[in-house]
A protein has these predicted regions:
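Non-catalytic peripheral regions of nucleotide-handling enzymes
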Residues: 1-191
Length: 191
């Protein structure tokens, strides 16, 4: 976990000032996480009012990241979809940014065909949709062990990882297919 915060002698009351402070805190968090070789999966901003109230905003990512701009976009999405908008009132004394969940993040080099960029774009889209709609509303298919072809896959919430499925084993070159290549409608008797 990583926590950084800013204290203000004069309470902060403007929304653009809050975003600027969050940008700075995200840059600090990125430096700390980079030193540890980690990336954040969950980010929590705590906005402390002068009257003692605390407003917390949490965003999560599908993969570890240190990209402050991407996390800031998620915070903007979260703020835009709040039922109760952020009211600074008399202002904020402290803004705290915490990373409660961090995982190892190895440096990644893109493939020669540019596939890494496409995978990152899909992961960013999933993060934005999960922030807008909720993490349980963004689904993906995983393999299941079943003898019925229509039950070979199941919908599960997107987590960004490969967990949750059995994975289809690769076919061996000399092995016949495990089921017919064509399903007849109506079914035909096997002779």
């Amino acid at each position: 976990a990583c926590v950084v915060e800013r204290h203000f002698p004069e309470p902060l009351q403007r929304a653009d000032g809050i975003e600027a402070v969050l940008d700075g805190l995200l840059a600090e968090v990125a430096r700390v996480l980079e030193g540890r070789g980690q990336g954040g999966r969950s980010f929590e901003a705590g906005l402390f009012h002068t009257d003692g109230q605390v407003r917390r905003l949490t965003v999560a990512t599908g993969r570890p990241t240190r990209d402050g701009a991407a996390v800031m976009r998620l915070f903007r999405e979260r703020i835009a979809t709040l039922a109760d908008p952020i009211d600074p009132g008399y202002g904020f004394d402290v803004i705290r940014l915490a990373v409660p969940l961090a995982e190892p993040l190895a440096p990644a080099a893109p493939d020669l065909d540019g596939r890494a960029a496409g995978q990152e774009a899909v992961a960013d889209l999933v993060d934005r949709l999960a922030t807008r709609l909720g993490p349980d509303r963004v689904l993906r298919l995983v393999a299941r062990d079943s003898h019925h072809p229509e039950r070979e896959a199941a919908l599960v919430p997107w987590t960004g990882g490969a967990a949750g499925g059995i994975g289809w084993p690769p076919a061996l070159p000399d092995e016949p297919p495990s089921r017919p290549l064509q399903i007849f409608d109506p079914p035909q008797p096997v002779e």
